[in-house]
From Swiss-Prot:
One of its GO terms (cellular component) is nucleus. It comes from the Eukaryota. This is Protein ripply3. InterPro entries: Ripply_fam (IPR028127). The lineage of its organism: Eukaryota, Metazoa, Chordata, Craniata, Vertebrata.
Amino acid sequence: MRPEAAGVREARGRLCHCPGDDPGRLPLPRGPESSIPAPWRPWMSPPPGDAELTRTERPCESWGDQHTSGSKGAFGFQHPVRLYLPVSKRQEYLQSSGEKVLASFPVQATIHFYNDDSESGSEEEQEEEAQPNHLQCLEAEVRDSAQEERAE
């Protein structure tokens, strides 16, 4: 090893060392009595003494899927969290209210639409059956243009 490299190594040792590297220093306390707070993990329940994050009331059934098994996460919600909105309000959601709902919700969630009126669903199906689909329109255009070419 070159002497210049040894000098760099010594300089690094003096400039950069961890507090735990000093043999004369006591080790940092670890465990529950430590003064350093544990990092917050949203998928885990808050510590029992943390009153800010503890939620005593149950979330509304329509705001989350309460039928899956597992432990409760942040704010007392069970993950995955699903917000249910009626299909009739889908357009309103797409315009503005969905963004507001998700922004005001305290945890990450997905929005699922449900059929709120069985009659409206059957009406939509009847309308779809009455309207020709895109492929049928293209086929009709091709046939029409072929007939026009033959006529000329």
